[in-house]
């Protein structure tokens, strides 16, 4: 029992240490979310036509400083363990990033003409053939833009045109052939569906794994006079990441021994939150641009995705922390119960022992009295005989 108590106490100590480690990670993520939120505000400002490119250049300098801090946050460590650099993740399978739109009509496919597009309620987006379509996307830290006339082009053509303009097959439109509620499979092997289970239209990255990751993209519709059509723009920009890009990797999750037996452990997968991991920095080290209005609009989408990634990770960390706290309470209760049981078996029952002592003492005293009386009687009898 002594060994069991010590084992339970050590397991409890492990859970407390694990919680402390996760609090360090959570602090870094909270700070990163604050920074990304501030950057989104600046990107929104940079997307305003009232600013000149020289103004945006000053914003870019500030952007770069903030993203330097994001990278510093990703290097936070606990006892020499770099928690947020992406090294400690569970086994994953390679996935191709997917973006799904559930703002357009449920029967929308890649073959639907832009002029025929409707919103979820079936109301026309009123896109005219003379309207201009501007598409911007961020990949490997670089922003690509293209503008063309709507004409009789289709939804699929939006992505094919920007592939042609950028000279890179950034998007794979084969998945847009049909509208479906099933999107694909994520890095853990689970099927992914639209949030409400209704049909949506999905476009995928042109390359599997993180090499093909699109940090974000925006689609803007303007009329021939240059006025933005907000309803159409909002509906077309309703593509959100439904499957994250992931490379195949082995299991390297952090492990906390939370029990006294082999196998009673808890694995914790913690993803990276560096600017590169969030799609905000290219392989050349350069950060995303807000140098032009179009770049800034694409940056807004990229920052939205980055914020969601960190918040998802923070939610996971919160779940790990809650489990460790409940486990610690359970281990503490077990330790107390085993200690009490040990005391019952080993330690003396004081009340019982006092009662037994008093009883034995009375018996001894009675015996001594009887012996003394017997001695007196013997002496008296001998005196009579003498």
PLM-predicted stretches and their roles:
Residues 330:
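Glycine-rich phosphate-binding loops at beta-strand->alpha-helix junctions
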Residues 16-321, 347, 369-372, 376-386:
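Amphipathic alpha-helical coiled-coil/heptad-repeat segments
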Residues 1-13:
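Short, charge-rich amphipathic alpha-helices with coiled-coil/heptad character
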Residues 8, 42-43, 338:
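Non-transmembrane amphipathic alpha-helical segments
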Residues 352, 357-371:
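Short, highly charge-biased, low-complexity peptide segments
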Residues 306, 313, 317-320, 324, ...:
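Amphipathic, heptad-repeat alpha-helical segments used for oligomerization and assembly
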């Amino acid at each position: 029992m002594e060994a069991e108590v010590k084992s339970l106490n050590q397991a409890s100590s492990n859970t407390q240490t694990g919680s402390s480690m996760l609090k360090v990670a959570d602090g870094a993520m909270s700070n990163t979310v604050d920074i990304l939120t501030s950057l989104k505000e600046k990107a929104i400002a940079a997307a305003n036509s009232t600013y000149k490119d020289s103004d945006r250049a000053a914003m870019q300098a500030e952007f770069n400083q903030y993203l330097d801090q994001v990278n510093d946050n990703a290097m936070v460590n606990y006892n020499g363990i770099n928690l947020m650099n992406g090294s400690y993740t569970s086994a994953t399978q390679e996935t191709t990033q997917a973006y799904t739109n559930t703002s357009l009509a449920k029967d929308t496919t890649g073959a639907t003409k832009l002029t025929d597009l409707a919103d979820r309620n079936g109301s026309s987006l009123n896109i005219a053939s003379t309207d201009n379509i501007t598409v911007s996307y961020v990949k490997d830290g670089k922003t690509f833009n293209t503008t063309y006339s709507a004409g009789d082009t289709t939804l699929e053509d939006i992505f094919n045109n920007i592939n042609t303009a950028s000279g890179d097959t950034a998007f794979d439109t084969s998945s847009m052939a049909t509208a479906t509620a099933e999107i694909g499979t994520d890095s853990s092997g689970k099927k992914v569906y639209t949030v409400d289970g209704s049909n949506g239209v999905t476009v995928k990255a042109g390359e599997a794994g993180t090499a093909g990751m699109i940090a974000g993209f925006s689609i803007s519709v303007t009329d021939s006079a240059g006025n933005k059509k907000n309803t159409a723009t909002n509906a077309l920009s309703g593509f959100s990441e439904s499957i994250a890009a992931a490379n195949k990797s082995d299991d390297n999750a952090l492990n906390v021994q939370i029990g006294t037996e082999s196998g009673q452990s808890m694995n914790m997968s913690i993803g990276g939150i560096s600017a590169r991991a969030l799609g905000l920095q290219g392989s050349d080290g350069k950060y995303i641009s807000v140098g032009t209005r179009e770049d800034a609009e694409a940056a807004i989408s990229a920052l939205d995705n980055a914020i969601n990634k960190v918040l998802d990770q923070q939610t996971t960390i919160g779940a790990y922390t809650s489990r460790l706290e409940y486990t610690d309470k359970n281990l503490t209760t077990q330790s107390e119960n085993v200690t009490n049981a040990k005391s019952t078996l080993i330690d003396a029952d004081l009340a019982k022992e006092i009662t037994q002592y008093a009883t034995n003492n009375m018996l001894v005293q009675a015996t001594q009295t009887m012996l003394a009386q017997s001695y007196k009687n013997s002496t008296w009898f001998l005196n009579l005989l003498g």
